[in-house]
Amino acid sequence: MGQKIDPRGFRLAVTRNWSSKWFANSQNFPGMLKEDIDVREFLKAKLKNASVSRITIERPAKSARITIHTARPGVVIGKKGEDIEVLKQELQKRMGVPVHVNIEEVRKPEIDAQIIADGIASQLEKRVMFRRAMKRAMQNAMRLGALGIKIMSSGRLNGIEIARTEWYREGRVPLHTLRADVDYATSEAHTTYGVIGIKVWVYKGDMKPGQVSAEPTQPEKKMRKGGRNAAAN
């Protein structure tokens, strides 16, 4: 079912590519996969304030190439490139092979699902009202060309006693259509009341066979609100 599965894995090899690009035999595969997970967790913790969208890992010929997609490349690189050199040395110690680090700038962070989710989580940790944070993110995404966006928050919202789920949607988010370019991400806000989970779906348009990204057209003006038992598209 399109509503239940991760939209990224559902569209893998159809409209999306792998985030880890390497080959290994059955003996080395588990260790290399665990290493990729550890590297991503390390980078996300290290670059928490750099608005990191995604991290791509390649392993050509006894080396590693890591591409960091970020909305704030200056924070990653640092003054005169000092921070990126320190980061490269730490990654080489962890992976045990020469590491090349590439930085790619995210041109429109307002329609990037991971950056939106992390931004909402950061606001919730600063005690911003969850409805205000969600609606502001939706307005920015639709203004900059997204065709649809859906945001869901779950937990003790605004510190209530019983945890619940609220979601908002503007435009359309077709989860069953494989050619639809749907970006999806999750994040967590660690508040004084507990953990609040955030899920974000961003629909950027339909993609043609072999196309990597699509330019969104004029957005459709429509908003829906749902509660705990609401069914979403």
Swiss-Prot record:
Belongs to the universal ribosomal protein uS3 family. One of its GO terms (cellular component) is cytosolic small ribosomal subunit. Residues 39-107 form the KH type-2 domain. The gene is rpsC. One of its GO terms (biological process) is translation. This is Small ribosomal subunit protein uS3. Gene3D superfamilies: 3.30.300.20, Ribosomal protein S3, C-terminal domain. Coiled coil: none annotated. Keywords: Ribonucleoprotein, Ribosomal protein, RNA-binding, rRNA-binding.
